[in-house]
């Protein structure tokens, strides 16, 4: 990403234009289709407002779930929420590329906002292919001629190579929206050689994903220290030869984590700057106690208080801190303290903090203040994972190829 030049909304003329804005408002819904977390919807309000304030007519496109899944729903409820947060009418169109949708787009006046229905109603949108193929898709061929500009504000889908993400930049002058721009500039700090030391705090249960991240960080010598928690810490503890007792080993085996031991051991033997807990908070017959990592008898549920202190001391001196995944079973109040400690140290330190994913946010206490000038909460789950794993992000590649005609 570091060598890609991504055009932003500052690089193109966006005054009184017809704008196609790709957002990601894919939200968790309950069994009745009611949205239970609208944070992704709120995230895009600033970009939409800016476009409307410049006299543009804006057509929004997004997906919701996948065909066959329970969360594959219409975007009608999403339109109501966007309207609520903008405090203005948002026209919902129960169509995507049909005659009705195209007619409504043509009729949309300046300062008007229209949301097309779930873009994954179009089967092409589920196909992963290069931009050169997707620019020829029905979706792009039907919609692109109706617009002056395409803006991609959907960082959470940046790892997808689908028509709505990579097709339009080859057909229209295109740029990153403000959410996308913030994500890209925040993540660029990870590769800035001057911002050291860089501390990566990696926990949670997605161990197969996390070991890919660690291998990339070590290969590119990006991380000065990697602090492990959650099941990631247990993997590296076992790889180092620690006996975590049969019960914990059984859990790791069931989750397929023991198969990763050779890769973890190889990283440790290479001298990678990986820190593992010196103590754990464990549960024994419903009781919570702390035990040294070398003498674990209970079921591991969190990092211990000594480990939390050690990790916090590393974090406070860092220039960049990346937090991905909790240190323990964060859903249980008894095992939140490890995550709270590293989060508190990050927020109180002098460095720039990137928080990936919502789990760590749930560890925030009311007295923990987030300074938006030095803290970035990423919206991109899969996209962030691929980026940290060293993969290219198709959305950014496509934007870098865009036919930008600034001022035309």
Swiss-Prot record:
> Which pathway, per its entry?
Carbohydrate degradation; glycolysis; pyruvate from D-glyceraldehyde 3-phosphate: step 2/5
Q: Which PANTHER family match?
A: PHOSPHOGLYCERATE KINASE, PHOSPHOGLYCERATE KINASE 1, CHLOROPLASTIC-RELATED
Q: What is the lineage of its organism?
A: Archaea, Thermoproteota, Thermoprotei, Sulfolobales, Sulfolobaceae
* Name the record gives this protein: Phosphoglycerate kinase
The UniProt record gives the binding positions of substrate as 24-26, 40, 63-66, 120, 160
Q: Which GO terms describe its molecular function?
A: ADP binding; ATP binding; phosphoglycerate kinase activity
Q: Where's it found, cell-wise?
A: Cytoplasm
Annotated source species = Saccharolobus solfataricus (strain ATCC 35092 / DSM 1617 / JCM 11322 / P2)
This enzyme's EC code(s):
2.7.2.3
**Which family, according to the similarity comment?**
Belongs to the phosphoglycerate kinase family.
Name the gene behind this protein.
pgk
Q: Which GO terms describe its biological process?
A: gluconeogenesis; glycolytic process
Disulfide bond positions: none
Q: What class of enzyme is it?
A: transferase
